[in-house]
C-alpha cells in the first residue's frame, strides 16, 4: 500500500504545534506495519536544511510559478519537499510575518501543497505513486479538491487536527488556484462567500477523521463546529467521519530513556522521578521542596487552552501550598497576567514565556500534575505525555482529554482505572474543585503513587493508531 501524507510541518525539522508531532511519528509507525509511506511538505528553510542531500524529481510550471519537487530520506521516511524559494524561503513562522500578519499569498503557498499532492497521484514521480493521499488540516485541504477535479486518481483521507483554523480566503483568489469554477458553491469549498481550505478537505475527501473519538462527535454540534455542523452531520450519517486517537512517539517521549531529563525512571523506579522535580524547581526559581505539590503548564496561552480559567482558579492552588511552573507563549494579556502572578508569588510561581522543546521534557518529568484546562481539545498530546511520565493530568472533559484521562473518583480508585483529575464545566469554580481533589490525593502519598503507576501503565503508542489508519485505507481501496 502506497500512502502520501500531506502536511505543513514535520517534527523535529519544523514544529509550531502538535500537528508536527503527529506527522513526525505516524509514517514511521505505518512503515513498521508494512506500508510504503512518504510525506509531502513545503520547502520551508528548516525543512530544506534537514534534507540537504535531496534529489530533484521534477520541475513544474504551476499557477504559483515554477517550482522544483525534490525527494530525500529523513530518519527512514521518504520526504518530498516543494522547492519554491519565492513562496517558502522566509524567516520565522511558516504562516505569518514578524508582526504576526498572515502572509498575503498564503492561498497560493498552501494551494500549491495540495496541487503537488494531486500531481504525485497522477504519476509526477515515475518511480512512486500513492494509492492514498492523507491530507492534514486546512493547509493540505485543497489536496482533496484537486484530486476530485482530476477524477480521483487516488483515494483521499482528510484529518482535522483543529477545526478552529479554517484557511479562509477571499473569493477573488479562486481564479488563481486552477480549480473548476463550479467547486465554489455550498456543495464544495465555498463558506459564507469565502474559499475555505478546511471545507475543501471536509467535503471532497473520501473519508474524514479527527484525532480522537470524542472530538469526532463534538464537531457535529454547533458549539464545536465553527459553522461546519451541517456538513459534518452529513458526514457522520454517511459513515465517513470517525475519530482515531493520536499516539505518543515512544522514541522521543519516554522517561526510561529520555536524555533531556535530569534522571531517567520507569514505573518500577518511580522514586527517581523526585530528582527531576528538584531540578525543575531550581530552574523555575521555585522553593526547592519535594513536599510541595508542583503543578505545571506547557501550552499556548490562549482562551481555547483555558488558561484564563487557571488564572481565576490560582488562589485555590496557591492557598493549598502548591507551586506552579508555566512554559508557554501566546496572548499578550495572558502572558502579562501570569508574569504578574509570578512576581507577586516568588518561589511559588515560575513562568517562562516562549517554547523550548527540551525544557518541556524537563517540566513533564519534574511536575506532579500537568494542567490542561482546555475549552476544547481535538486530541491533546500534553496529557498523554503526562500519563507517560507519571505527572498526573488535570484536564477538562472534552475531546481527546475525555478519551484518555479517568478521574480519581472513588469508584475509579477502587477498580484501578483512575489516572488523573477531570472537571466538566468550563469555569474557574469547577477547575478549582479539581485542584482541591488533587491536593487531597497529594496528602495520601501511597494512593498518589498508586495512581501514578496506573497512569504510566496506559498505552498510547503509535502502533494502534497506525493500525487503525491502515485498516481505513484498506476499506477505501
UniProtKB/Swiss-Prot annotation:
PANTHER family: ALPHA AMYLASE DOMAIN-CONTAINING PROTEIN (PTHR45825:SF11), GRANULE-BOUND STARCH SYNTHASE 1, CHLOROPLASTIC/AMYLOPLASTIC (PTHR45825). Transmembrane segments: none annotated. Belongs to the glycosyltransferase 1 family. Bacterial/plant glycogen synthase subfamily. It comes from the Bacteria. The keyword Phosphoprotein does not apply. It comes from Edwardsiella ictaluri (strain 93-146). InterPro entries: Glyco_trans_1, GS/SS, Starch_synth_cat_dom. It catalyses: [(1->4)-alpha-D-glucosyl](n) + ADP-alpha-D-glucose = [(1->4)-alpha-D-glucosyl](n+1) + ADP + H(+). Gene3D superfamilies: Glycogen Phosphorylase B (3.40.50.2000). Its EC number is 2.4.1.21. Pfam families: Glyco_transf_5, Glycos_transf_1. One of its GO terms (cellular component) is cytosol. It is an enzyme of class 2 (transferase). ADP-alpha-D-glucose binds at residue 15. Synthesizes alpha-1,4-glucan chains using ADP-glucose. Pathway: Glycan biosynthesis; glycogen biosynthesis. This is Glycogen synthase. Keywords: Glycogen biosynthesis, Glycosyltransferase, Transferase.
Amino acid at each position: 500500500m502506497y500512502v502520501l501524507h500531506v502536511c505543513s510541518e514535520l517534527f523535529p525539522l519544523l514544529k509550531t504545534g502538535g500537528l508536527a508531532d503527529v506527522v513526525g511519528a505516524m509514517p514511521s509507525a505505518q512503515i513498521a506495519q508494512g506500508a510504503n509511506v512518504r510525506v509531502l511538505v513545503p520547502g520551508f528553510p528548516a525543512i530544506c536544511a534537514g534534507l540537504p542531500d535531496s534529489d530533484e524529481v521534477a520541475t513544474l510550471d504551476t499557477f504559483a510559478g515554477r517550482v522544483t519537487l525534490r525527494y530525500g530520506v529523513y530518519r527512514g521516511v521518504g520526504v518530498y519537499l516543494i522547492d519554491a524559494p519565492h513562496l517558502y524561503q522566509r524567516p520565522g513562522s511558516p504562516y505569518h510575518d514578524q508582526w504576526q500578519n498572515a502572509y498575503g499569498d498564503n492561498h497560493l503557498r498552501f494551494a500549491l501543497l495540495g496541487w503537488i499532492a494531486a500531481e504525485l497521484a497522477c504519476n509526477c514521480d515515475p518511480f512512486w505513486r500513492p494509492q492514498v493521499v492523507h491530507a492534514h488540516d486546512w493547509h493540505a485541504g485543497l489536496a482533496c479538491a484537486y484530486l476530485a477535479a482530476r477524477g480521483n486518481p487516488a483515494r483521499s483521507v482528510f484529518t482535522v487536527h483543529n477545526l478552529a483554523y479554517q484557511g479562509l480566503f477571499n473569493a477573488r483568489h479562486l481564479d488563481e488556484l486552477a480549480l473548476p469554477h463550479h467547486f465554489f458553491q455550498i456543495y464544495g469549498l465555498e463558506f459564507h462567500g469565502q474559499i475555505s481550505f478546511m471545507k475543501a478537505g471536509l467535503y471532497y475527501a473520501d473519508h474524514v477523521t479527527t484525532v480522537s473519538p470524542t472530538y469526532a462527535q463534538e464537531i457535529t454540534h454547533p458549539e464545536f463546529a465553527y459553522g461546519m455542523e451541517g456538513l459534518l452531520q452529513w458526514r457522520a450519517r454517511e459513515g465517513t467521519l470517525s475519530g482515531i486517537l493520536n499516539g505518543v512517539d515512544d522514541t522521543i517521549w519516554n522517561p526510561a530513556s529520555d536524555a533531556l531529563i535530569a534522571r531517567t525512571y520507569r514505573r518500577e523506579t518511580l522514586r527517581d522521578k523526585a530528582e527531576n522535580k528538584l531540578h525543575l524547581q531550581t530552574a523555575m526559581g521555585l522553593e526547592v521542596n519535594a513536599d510541595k505539590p508542583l503543578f505545571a503548564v506547557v501550552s499556548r496561552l490562549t482562551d481555547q487552552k483555558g488558561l484564563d480559567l487557571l488564572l481565576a482558579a490560582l488562589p485555590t492552588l496557591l492557598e493549598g501550598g502548591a507551586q506552579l511552573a508555566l512554559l508557554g507563549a501566546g496572548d499578550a494579556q495572558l502572558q502579562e497576567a501570569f508574569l504578574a502572578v509570578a512576581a507577586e508569588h516568588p518561589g511559588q510561581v515560575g513562568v517562562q514565556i516562549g517554547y523550548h522543546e527540551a525544557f518541556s521534557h524537563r517540566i513533564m518529568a519534574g511536575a506532579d500534575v500537568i494542567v490542561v484546562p482546555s475549552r476544547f481539545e481535538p486530541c491533546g498530546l500534553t496529557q498523554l505525555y503526562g500519563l507517560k511520565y507519571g505527572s498526573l493530568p488535570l484536564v477538562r472533559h472534552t475531546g481527546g482529554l475525555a478519551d484518555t484521562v479517568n478521574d480519581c473518583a472513588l469508584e475509579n480508585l477502587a477498580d484501578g482505572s483512575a489516572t488523573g483529575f477531570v472537571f466538566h464545566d468550563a469555569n474557574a469554580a469547577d477547575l478549582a474543585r479539581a485542584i482541591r481533589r488533587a491536593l487531597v490525593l497529594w496528602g495520601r502519598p501511597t494512593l498518589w503513587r498508586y495512581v501514578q503507576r496506573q497512569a504510566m501503565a496506559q498505552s498510547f503508542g503509535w502502533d494502534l493508531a497506525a493500525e487503525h489508519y491502515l485498516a481505513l485505507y484498506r476499506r477505501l481501496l
